[in-house]
Amino acid sequence: MKTFTLLAMLLLTACATNSEVEKRLLAMYEQDQSIRHQQLALTKAITTEGQTYLIDSLIQVIDIQQQIDQRNATFVDSLLQAGLPKELSDSAYHAIWIIIDHANLDMQEKHLSYIRQMAEERKIKFKEYATLYDRIEMKNNRPQRYGTQIIQFGTSNSPQLYLW
């Protein structure tokens, strides 16, 4: 079934117009960001406002987020393998970057060189490439090159930043 789904997606992307691919990528971006905003709001309510009764909702949102990330990553992976349509918008290229950034480590490593190429061609900002590069290094327990991955501890009045 997985093979059939992948083949169907490859055929779809091969036949898709720029407009269709663009719309799909932008919809994926919106869904990606929407679920993450829900997660952040629930996390804040639980951690800073003590609303622990929301933990089940947070777990459910994280599960949905993981499903969305996997579905988006599968589409972008097949799209990159089949070849991107030419002349996508900056927003579509940004969507590709964020989907790869939110994918698993294997996908991130697989497409890092493509993200670098997009940055060199100014289709995305270099800081987006740097973020992905550092995230991969962090996940592999190696030092960052650009210093983009930090965690804030403490209160908002006296935060302490920790560089991974």
Model-derived features with residue positions:
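Mature-region segments of soluble proteins
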Residues: 91-98, 107-164
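Residue-level signal for functionally critical sites in structured catalytic/ligand-binding pockets
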Residues: 3, 50, 69, 155-164
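C-terminal motif of bacterial Sec signal peptides marking the signal peptidase cleavage site
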Residues: 13-14
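Preference for long, solvent-exposed alpha-helical segments and helix-linker "stalks"
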Residues: 17-90, 99-106, 118-121, 126-137
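Sec-dependent signal peptide recognition
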Residues: 1-8
